[in-house]
């Protein structure tokens, strides 16, 4: 499995085990909130996004190079509640995701660091469904040229 997939699967796994709030449905497949029942909220869609890579060391004997990568992972959280409770519910979800991901910033030992860098509130959903889009940056290193 690629490191990118290992990171995404780790994020899915830790979010599936989160409590208060507990995420009922966590997936790497896109979510259509109109197709979900009330019992499936709050739910999360995790997707790997863009990535920047650079050499960390020059090539050495044997042709290997240590590289460093910053992978952006989108964590899209859907909540369903009354319009009066929407802001509170979204804020609770944001805080919980950050706390859960901070518990192991190495993503099970494959990364060097994990940080929540951006929170975007999307109000273009129906009034009882809220969406917060979290950008998670994961720093990891890998070696190229290994046989």
Describe every region a protein language model picked out.
Residues 1-38, 48-147:
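Charged, amphipathic alpha-helical segments and their flanking helix caps
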Residues 42-46:
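A short glycine-rich, His/Asp/Glu-containing loop-to-beta-strand
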């Amino acid at each position: 499995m690629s490191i990118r997939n290992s990171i995404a699967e780790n994020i899915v796994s830790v979010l599936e085990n989160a409590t208060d709030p507990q995420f009922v449905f966590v997936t790497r497949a896109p979510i259509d909130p109109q197709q979900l029942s009330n019992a499936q909220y709050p739910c999360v869609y995790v997707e790997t996004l863009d990535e920047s890579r650079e050499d960390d060391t020059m090539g050495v004997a044997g042709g290997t190079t240590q590289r460093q990568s910053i992978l952006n992972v989108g964590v899209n959280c859907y909540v369903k509640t009354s319009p009066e409770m929407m802001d509170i519910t979204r804020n609770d979800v944001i805080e919980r995701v950050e706390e859960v991901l901070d518990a192991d910033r190495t993503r099970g030992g494959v990364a060097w660091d994990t940080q929540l860098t951006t929170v975007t509130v999307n109000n273009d959903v129906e009034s009882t469904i809220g969406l917060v889009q979290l950008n998670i940056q994961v720093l990891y290193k890998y070696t190229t040229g290994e046989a």
